[in-house]
Amino acid sequence: MKTFVAKPETVKRDWYVVDATGKTLGRLATELARRLRGKHKAEYTPHVDTGDYIIVINADKVAVTGRKETDKLYYWHTGYVGGIKQATFKEMIARRPEAVIEIAVKGMLPKGPLGRAMFRKLKVYAGAEHQHAAQQPQVLDI
């Protein structure tokens, strides 16, 4: 008996919607990364993108434990000399709440072309509305 290897053209991808209200950031991101990779499926193949599409709503209501709301820092560089910037979790939620979940999930995905393809299947929205109703996403309770 030969080992099953999934082919990119035969992979069936479903659409799911996840409500991030009150969910802990790290625990939510771990499950999202697992499902984006396709590790929850029996036909998972490491070198093939077998994951599903995931829509995250209410990203502005995601929670963190402890004092991370004020102590956790996000860094980025503008590209100019001395252009290192930083913001706390609270400031990031106020400025761009989608980025908090995107950064957490992106760090848990493989680095390289396959990881970037997996990341493109993640759609994050700050509010309760999303523009993917035509895909008829199923509610995923994490």
UniProtKB/Swiss-Prot annotation:
Subunit note: Part of the 50S ribosomal subunit.
Source superkingdom: Bacteria
Function: This protein is one of the early assembly proteins of the 50S ribosomal subunit, although it is not seen to bind rRNA by itself. It is important during the early stages of 50S assembly.
Record-linked InterPro entries: Ribosomal_uL13, Ribosomal_uL13_bac-type, Ribosomal_uL13_CS, Ribosomal_uL13_sf
UniProt-listed CDD domains: Ribosomal_L13 (cd00392)
GO cellular component: a single term: cytosolic large ribosomal subunit
Any one Gene Ontology molecular-function term assigned to this protein's record: mRNA binding
Keywords: Ribonucleoprotein, Ribosomal protein
Entries under PANTHER family matching the protein: LARGE RIBOSOMAL SUBUNIT PROTEIN UL13M, RIBOSOMAL PROTEIN L13
Similarity comment text for this entry: Belongs to the universal ribosomal protein uL13 family.
Hydrolase is among the record's keywords: no
GO biological process, one term: negative regulation of translation
Protein name in UniProt: Large ribosomal subunit protein uL13
A Pfam family hit: Ribosomal_L13
